[in-house]
């Protein structure tokens, strides 16, 4: 009998992100998305050695990587980049030409894969909470065929019947180009939009489908071959823990409150920034 592999949810999510990467792709990542970056680097270190990384930090393109950090994150992208562009050139020129794959973290997402990163609340002038903003999301999601999403904390706050605002275009009748969101990974399972509606394709270890539905604000479709998410391999875990992210920066995206603050302090102390 094979022993059960011990892993954390952030490690599983990073591995699932890595497994969505195809060798030769250009991978885009926004600001403060270490879970995605860990997955991208893991893909290059395993099955996709020929990927390139495009970062919102400095609008740079690079082929090499450094271990994840907080105080040192700019060094990862600015120090390894082979070129830098301005933001407008990155959105209007680089993104359409290179057909980048990108994982976005939505504040809200609906059954069709439309998503909101503007604000919570219908009143834009006085929202309940102002979100990070759209960046290039409204542009990219109207034409790209490689839009992917990730949600570190699956809840009915994020998965809603109706968005407060729309910043990312999903499987909408208004779409004239692109195919809409292809895939979503959360801390509960993996999903696709094979029929234009969000569909559960796998559930993580220890999670049942009733719990996933209860934490989703609309009715989910279920894939005929729905199954448990395959676990990380020992080598994938070793790479994440020892080489790619020994400081556990990726875990910041799964935590909140005191736990997140404490981990942030640990990371900054380890980097010598405090």
Where are these regions (language model features)?
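N-terminal active-site beta-alpha-beta segment that forms phosphate/nucleotide-binding
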Residues: 2-80
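A conserved C-terminal secondary-structure "cap"
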Residues: 224-274
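Short, surface-exposed, charge-dense and proline/glycine-enriched linear segments
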Residues: 57-64, 82-87, 135-138, 252-269
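Conserved phosphate- and dinucleotide-binding cores of soluble alpha/beta proteins
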Residues: 67-232
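Residue-level detector of alpha-helical recognition elements and their boundaries
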Residues: 32, 54, 128, 227-228, ...
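Short, intrinsically disordered/low-complexity patches at protein termini
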Residues: 51-52, 140, 244-247
């Amino acid at each position: 009998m094979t022993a059960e592999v011990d892993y954390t949810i952030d490690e599983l999510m990073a591995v699932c992100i890595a497994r969505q990467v195809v060798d030769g792709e250009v991978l885009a990542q926004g600001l403060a998305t270490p879970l995605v970056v860990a997955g991208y680097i893991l893909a290059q270190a395993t099955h996709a050695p020929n990927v390139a990384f495009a970062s919102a930090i400095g609008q740079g393109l690079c082929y090499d990587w450094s271990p994840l950090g907080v105080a040192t994150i700019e060094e990862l992208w600015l120090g390894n980049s082979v070129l830098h562009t301005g933001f407008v050139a990155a959105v209007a020129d680089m993104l359409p030409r290179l057909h980048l794959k990108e994982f976005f973290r939505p504040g809200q997402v609906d059954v069709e894969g439309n998503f909101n990163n503007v604000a919570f609340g219908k009143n834009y002038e006085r929202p309940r909470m102002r979100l990070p903003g759209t960046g290039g999301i409204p542009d990219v999601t109207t034409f790209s065929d490689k839009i992917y999403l990730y949600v570190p904390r699956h809840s009915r706050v994020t998965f809603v019947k109706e968005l407060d605002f729309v910043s990312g275009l999903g499987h909408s009748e208004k779409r004239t180009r692109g195919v809409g969101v292809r895939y979503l990974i959360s801390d509960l399972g993996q999903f696709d939009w094979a029929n234009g509606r969000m569909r559960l394709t796998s559930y993580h270890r220890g999670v049942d489908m009733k719990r996933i539905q209860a934490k989703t604000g609309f009715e989910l479709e279920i894939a005929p071959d729905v199954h448990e998410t395959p676990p990380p391999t020992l080598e994938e875990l070793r790479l994440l823990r020892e080489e790619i992210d020994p400081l556990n920066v990726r875990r910041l995206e799964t935590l909140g409150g005191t736990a997140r603050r404490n981990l942030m302090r640990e990371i900054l102390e380890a980097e010598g920034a405090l």
